[in-house]
Regions:
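A short SAM/SAH-binding and catalytic strip from SAM-dependent methyltransferases
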Residues: 110-125
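Core SAM-dependent methyltransferase catalytic element
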Residues: 178, 192-212
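Short alpha-helix
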Residues: 37, 161-186
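A short glycine-rich, Lys/Arg-flanked "PGG" loop and its adjoining helix->strand segment in the class I
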Residues: 125-140
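Conserved class I S-adenosyl-L-methionine
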Residues: 141-171
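Class I SAM-dependent methyltransferase SAM/SAH-binding core
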Residues: 44-102
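Class I SAM-dependent methyltransferase Rossmann-like catalytic core
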Residues: 1-47
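A short acidic, Gly/Pro-enriched loop at the edge of an enzyme's catalytic core
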Residues: 99-112
């Protein structure tokens, strides 16, 4: 089911995303606390010997190395970044804002991961429906994000929303396009340390939803 209107899909920079991501960015876009907590979520949620796809990935997937995976497949826009991601068994390049059809077999994936990625989707409904298609019975999607973004590349739905509104938006896309009610995780820094703004941790938001 469609959730966004045409205005909400628009973004400041409508140029091809492939041009923006043509140069590799070997930096962390999320702080160490966020990355560590995300890895702990993956450790608890992902069963051993599962097939995992990391959509809109980069040079690090934050997957715990001590777990056993049947296969880890990566996707993104920059070949150099994905080649450096050593946990990936394979990967492919594709612009999801131009083509939302995932080149994977139906029911072939146990877990789909999206880290700091959903905020760039202009057609999240179509992609979410196809994610549901590739997931196995009771397969899960794990979407995580913070309050950071390349704002000129994020559609209006994201840039004009509060952090709570973004959670509501992602939830609506999920439950309208093949997923059960998601479990939502929020993690913030201790307010007692907020007197030094530059020491604030990135807020952690995560939605975990099971395929209907």
């Amino acid at each position: 089911m469609e959730v966004l209107n045409n205005y909400q899909r628009q973004k400041i920079d409508e140029s091809n995303d492939e041009d923006f991501y043509s140069s590799p960015k070997f930096v962390y876009h999320l702080d160490a606390n966020f990355r560590t907590y995300l890895s702990s979520v993956y450790k608890n949620e992902i069963k051993d010997n599962s097939t995992v796809v990391d959509l809109m990935s980069s040079w690090d997937s934050y997957l715990p190395l001590e777990k056993k995976y049947k296969q880890v497949i990566g996707h993104g826009l920059n070949k150099d970044e994905l080649e450096k991601n050593k946990i990936l068994d394979s990967f492919w390049n594709q612009n999801f804002n131009l083509n939302q059809k995932i080149p994977l077999d139906s029911s072939s994936i146990d877990y789909c991961l999206m880290v700091a990625a959903f905020q760039y989707l202009q057609y999240p409904e179509d992609l979410t429906r196809d994610i549901a298609r590739i997931l196995s019975d009771k397969g899960k999607i794990i979407i995580s994000f913070s309050n950071r973004a390349f704002w000129h590349k994020a559609p209006n739905i994201w840039t004009s929303s509060t952090e709570e509104e973004r959670l509501t938006y992602v939830r609506k896309v999920l439950i309208s396009n093949g997923f059960e009610e998601p479990r939502i995780i929020r993690k913030f820094n201790d307010i007692s340390f907020n007197f030094l703004p530059f020491l604030k941790n990135d807020p952690f938001y995560c939605l975990i939803a099971t395929k209907e």
